[in-house]
Amino acid sequence: MNILLTNDDGIHASGLRAIYNELVKLGHNVFPFAPTVERSGASNSVSLNVPLTTQDVYDGDFKGTAINGTPVDCVKVGLAKLHENPPDLIISGINAGHNVGTDILYSGTVAAAMEGCVAGIPSIAFSRPREEVDPTQSYAEHAANLLKKIDFSLVPKGQILNINYPSISIKKTLGIKVCAMSTQGWEHKLHKKKDDNGKPYWFISPYIPYSHGISQTDVFFLLEGWITITPLMFNMTAQTTLSNLEQHSFT
């Protein structure tokens, strides 16, 4: 397959380099387009009306393109550069840190994959625990081999797969669980501070407020020790409310 590879951790991130190596070993043609620097939390943001520059990055057998933009910018530029031979698949990751629950709303990793499905291309986001329980290469090997087992005919256009590895060794996981997105996630603490000149500023830091997840969701199963697969879609229409409002009179 021709695969467009991206992330939000940046072109030099170990997760991107590791899965690149594994995909190439399996015979795939891999084209990395990733941010010049880390852009975690960028979500679906795009750089409007500002120059986006690209730089070829060579490191041993690795060849990729660094872009001074967001993860979504990287996918857009990548698709433009590959327009004569479009990718069969877009992979975002492997991210350092889980993207489950409401984290998904802020995730540049998931947003990059979602940009792929907006373009009508099958897309997957991979995330591992922030603390490396296993070497990054182990997650990459598992992720690359998992691709062979995914039946993309079961994933309609306009949807992606969001895959997360739990905070235990891959060998100790309970298996793979397909599950729904939780409404839990990171919370953000705001701290008011002052710089060296006494000028006040705000600092946002994330923390996890839960010790267990809402039953049968990605957070729950991840904490239980499962590898989670959650299908997501960019059509955010609330169908039940839509139907109810259609029956409502606004006159």
From Swiss-Prot:
It catalyses: a ribonucleoside 5'-phosphate + H2O = a ribonucleoside + phosphate. SUPFAM superfamilies: SurE-like. Keywords: Cytoplasm, Hydrolase, Metal-binding, Nucleotide-binding. A divalent metal cation binds at D8, D9, S40, N95. The keyword Acetylation does not apply. Nucleotidase that shows phosphatase activity on nucleoside 5'-monophosphates. This is 5'-nucleotidase SurE. It comes from Lawsonia intracellularis (strain PHE/MN1-00). The gene is surE.
